Amino acid sequence: MKNTLVASNNNSDVGSYTELEGMMNLARLMATSKVTIPTHLKNEGDCLAIVMQSAQWGMNPFSVAQKTFLLNGVLGYESQLVSAIINKNAPIKQRLQYEFIGNWDKVIGNTKEKTSQKGNTYRVNASTPADEKGCGVKVSATMNGENKPRELTLMFAQVTLRNSTLWAEDPKQQLAYLAAKKWARLYCPDVILGVYTKDE
């Protein structure tokens, strides 16, 4: 079929896709969407970038588009999507494994209310360095062809940039997402090359 979107097996190079014309047609269609993609992608060029990137990841471009945001003129990806990209495309035997360490009792639910410049209220994490001491997560996965898992430990206190209210609502989840991204940047950086989140 002329307009079928097909990615090559190596998933490494946009130039290896067999139907660029199909991608361009899909991008034009996406750009006309009223509710299924965010407003910052209402143009063919950005939609084409999403289509090409989605093909490389083996994902639905409309789903990927919903997990993007625009910050200071740069297109970013939500942490949930980045974690999914890693689990789907990293050369690992199984999904990333997480082990939380430390006493989180003084961190989870420890929030305070703040007011934005526009007058909107939101909650932020209110834990102190003493509360966060020892709290962290270990993320690990075994690479294909290896028997020993590769690990990375990220402590909550190491995270100084917490740009999302989710750091207050669900700090364990946010730390796990960030640890997964750091693990991938260390052990298989090509999988998320050029992918940035709000924490960066």
Where are these regions (language model features)?
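Polyanion-binding surfaces on beta-sheet-dominated domains and ring/shell assemblies
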Residues: 2-200
